[in-house]
């Protein structure tokens, strides 16, 4: 009988319906309810992208397809997928409890975020390992980052190339690629967090692979807190690149995310497009990885490499 390995797929989570927004936001705010104005602002953003984010559906599809792919690629062990979310059910702890109940003794934990940071990956894996420690007889093997995975870089190289190939030579000369990820509080830099460096590396790999000479790194979706967040913000960067260098075609690659969701559909497709419209420039944004076969193959490689290194 094949050994069963847990596949713990972790992600941020998103409201399933409009009624979930308040409790979801309250969880993000560590139990503090948002003000009516804050709640109205967030609800308005969801309504602007069609009422609710497609993220919940995409995340589940990614996780299910990954489980299937891993069991197709090898016959040595049987992977059982468990989905654990940071801010809405099924919570990370729920997933770990389900694994324990099913008699899983070893699990590979994959966060659907390519870059490592203490705020994201470390906190997800930490929560999973803490719960496993309480239950006993369950070891969680966490994957720190996978932004260097060849198939991940290749996905974005192909996506960016696809857009540039549709441009005339004259347009290409005045086009710029903005590679971005979710901003985090600036204090992580002083603590030696590798997150900003990893995004810079990712941008270099993609620009080189796609043969794009003009590119810049930006940050997006910063939180509304008194602390400073990492910049430049993608909207400010867009204006600056237009004013300084006269770029009038902007290609946004939000590589810190793996699916179409609020931060991409609103912060990029709405807010950044408002800026490009304002300055009379063209807006482009490649399709996100979502549950594409190429991306699922990338994640499967990541999991199999981790399994080889720890078991």
Swiss-Prot record:
**Listed GO biological process terms:** heme biosynthetic process
* Gene Ontology terms: cellular component: cytoplasm
Pathway of this protein? Answer: Porphyrin-containing compound metabolism; protoheme biosynthesis
Annotated positions binding Fe(2+): 182, 263
Broadest EC class? lyase
Q: Which reaction does it catalyse?
A: Fe-coproporphyrin III + 2 H(+) = coproporphyrin III + Fe(2+)
Q: Where does Fe-coproporphyrin III bind?
A: 12, 29, 45-46, 53, 124
Q: Where in the cell is it found?
A: Cytoplasm
Q: Which Gene3D superfamilies match?
A: 3.40.50.1400
Q: Which Pfam families match?
A: Ferrochelatase
Report keywords, A-Z. Answer: Cytoplasm, Heme biosynthesis, Iron, Lyase, Metal-binding, Porphyrin biosynthesis
InterPro entries reported in the protein's UniProt record:
Ferrochelatase, Ferrochelatase_AS, Ferrochelatase_C, Ferrochelatase_N
EC numbers on record: 4.99.1.9
Task performed by this protein: Involved in coproporphyrin-dependent heme b biosynthesis. Catalyzes the insertion of ferrous iron into coproporphyrin III to form Fe-coproporphyrin III.
Q: Which NCBIfam families does the entry link to?
A: hemH, PRK12435.1
Query: Which family does the UniProt entry place this protein in?
Result: Belongs to the ferrochelatase family.
Q: HAMAP family per the record?
A: Ferrochelatase
Q: What is this protein called?
A: Coproporphyrin III ferrochelatase
- The organism is Bacillus mycoides (strain KBAB4) (Bacillus weihenstephanensis)
């Amino acid at each position: 009988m094949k050994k069963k390995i847990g596949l713990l797929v972790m992600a941020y989570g998103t409201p399933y319906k409009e009624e979930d927004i308040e409790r979801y936001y309250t969880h993000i705010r560590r139990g503090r309810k948002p003000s009516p104005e804050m709640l109205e602002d967030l609800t308005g953003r969801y309504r602007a992208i069609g009422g609710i984010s497609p993220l919940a559906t995409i995340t589940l599809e990614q996780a299910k397809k990954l489980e299937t792919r891993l069991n197709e690629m090898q016959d040595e062990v049987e992977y059982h997928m468990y989905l654990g979310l940071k801010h809405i059910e099924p919570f990370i702890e729920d997933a770990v409890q389900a694994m324990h109940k099913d008699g899983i003794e070893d699990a590979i934990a994959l966060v659907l975020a390519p870059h490592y940071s203490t705020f994201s990956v470390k906190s997800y894996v930490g929560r999973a390992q803490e719960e496993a420690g309480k239950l006993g007889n369950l070891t969680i093997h966490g994957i720190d980052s996978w932004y260097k995975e060849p198939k991940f870089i290749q996905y974005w190289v192909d996506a960016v190339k696809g857009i540039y190939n549709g441009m005339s030579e004259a347009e290409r000369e005045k086009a710029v690629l903005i590679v971005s990820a979710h901003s985090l509080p600036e204090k992580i830099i002083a603590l030696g967090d590798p997150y900003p460096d990893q995004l810079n590396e990712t941008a270099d790999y993609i620009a080189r692979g796609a043969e794009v000479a003009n590119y810049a790194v930006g940050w997006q979706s910063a939180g509304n807190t008194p602390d400073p967040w990492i910049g430049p913000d993608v909207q400010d960067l867009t204006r600056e690149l237009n004013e300084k260098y006269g770029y009038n075609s902007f290609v946004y690659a939000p590589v810190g995310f793996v699916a179409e969701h609020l931060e991409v559909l609103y912060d990029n497709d709405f807010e950044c497009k408002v800026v490009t419209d304002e300055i009379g420039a063209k807006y482009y944004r490649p399709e996100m990885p979502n549950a594409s076969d190429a991306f699922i193959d990338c994640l499967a490689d990541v999991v199999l490499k981790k399994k080889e290194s720890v078991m």
